[in-house]
């Protein structure tokens, strides 16, 4: 069976999405998402009717002292394809600025796992790999 890499990444917001503090983040979403979709090895990403996933309720168990949690989930042909996208182009600029928009979290906020090719993971399904990495650390079941 052929597999693809699934990734889930959550972030605790430091301010509401509508706030001035997050204006640059929100303004960049369409461009960053389009860049992902055009990247070699990209397969699928979680999105609602707005074209992004910021309005999709997920991981509410992890809100803690933040105003909310946002989720990013996608599938890729390989670890290398995801890495090349994450650390290149506009996305790496967003990574550099993440402390302006999100709380620093001690626990893992990202999990990777293998899914059958063409499978689109659900929010509920992505909950397990993230909790697993937090409890057990990276293993072949779920890793970072």
Pin down the residues of each PLM region.
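Short S/T/G/P-rich N-terminal loop/turn motif that feeds into the first structured element of a domain
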Residues: 1-69, 106-144
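An amphipathic, aromatic/His-enriched active-site/gating alpha helix that lines ligand/cofactor pockets
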Residues: 19, 66-68, 79-108
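Short, charged/polar surface micro-motifs in flexible loops or helix N-caps
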Residues: 51-53, 77-82
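Generic transmembrane alpha-helix motif of multi-pass integral membrane proteins
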Residues: 72-75
């Amino acid at each position: 069976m052929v597999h693809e890499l699934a990734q889930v990444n959550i972030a605790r917001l430091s301010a509401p999405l509508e706030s001035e503090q997050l204006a640059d983040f929100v303004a960049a979403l369409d461009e960053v998402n389009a860049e992902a979709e055009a990247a070699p090895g990209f397969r699928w990403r979680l999105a609602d009717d707005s074209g992004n996933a910021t309005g999709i309720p997920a991981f509410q168990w992890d809100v803690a002292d933040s105003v909310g949690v946002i989720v990013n989930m996608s599938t890729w042909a390989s670890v290398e394809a995801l890495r090349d996208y994450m650390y290149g182009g506009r996305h790496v600029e967003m990574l550099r600025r993440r402390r302006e928009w999100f709380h620093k979290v001690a626990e893992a906020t990202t999990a990777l796992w293998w899914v059958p090719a063409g499978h689109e993971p659900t929010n509920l399904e992505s909950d397990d790999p993230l909790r697993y990495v937090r409890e057990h650390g990276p293993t072949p079941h779920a890793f970072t």
